Amino acid sequence: YGSCNPCVPSVDLSLQGIIDFTVPAGGSNGKAIHLVALQDIADLSIYGIGVANNGGGTDGQEYTFDAISVLAGDQILLARSPSDMALYFDSCYSQFDHVLTATSAISQNGDDAIELFLNGSVVETFGDINVDGTGECWEYMDSWAYKSAGDSTCLGGNWIFGGVNCTDGTTTTYNSSCPYPLCPLPSGCTDSLASNYDPSALVDDGSCLYSVTFNVDMNCE
């Protein structure tokens, strides 16, 4: 109050994952951007996305979010093909609170930087808009990048990566070599010798059961 400085809006939305899956349908159907709401947002349409292709600098805001409200902690998936994402994420798809259909502007090829806009101004950037990401530490071709501490050298140590081409030839995130970090790994018995072996389980939960054979000597002598 009484200040001549304009109010600076808080940034209540954040990039969480940049996705370039190789889904069975192919094409652009595996492209998506994962975001998380840091606070309640009454109108998501004040935010937008831009894809800076091939190191050519900013392309400005190319996508504007729908005018919906979201709650703090909500996981938001902006996907070129929600139906293909539902199949590829399998049971993990339910982890997303909102799934929005993206326009063709969401066109990242695994070597493109991403800009998050608020009221037309850039508030967060993944990658370097002036650098083609091919061969860079932040390349995510046919893979994903996910915001999490772990890599001490790339992008300030704030992102981890699935590994280039790690989703090629797979049908779900769970049968790839790089399950998406948001997704709880299926648990069950992982021992193929057990009677209740679960081939879909990736984490052994200690539930394995084994058949026991008894040899009974019926000789009464």
Predicted regions and their residues:
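Residues within well-ordered beta-strands of beta-sheet-rich folds
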Residues: 14, 32-36, 48-50, 75-79, ...
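Conserved beta-structured recognition patch
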Residues: 46, 98-176
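Short, surface-exposed secondary-structure edge patches
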Residues: 38, 65-69, 105, 137
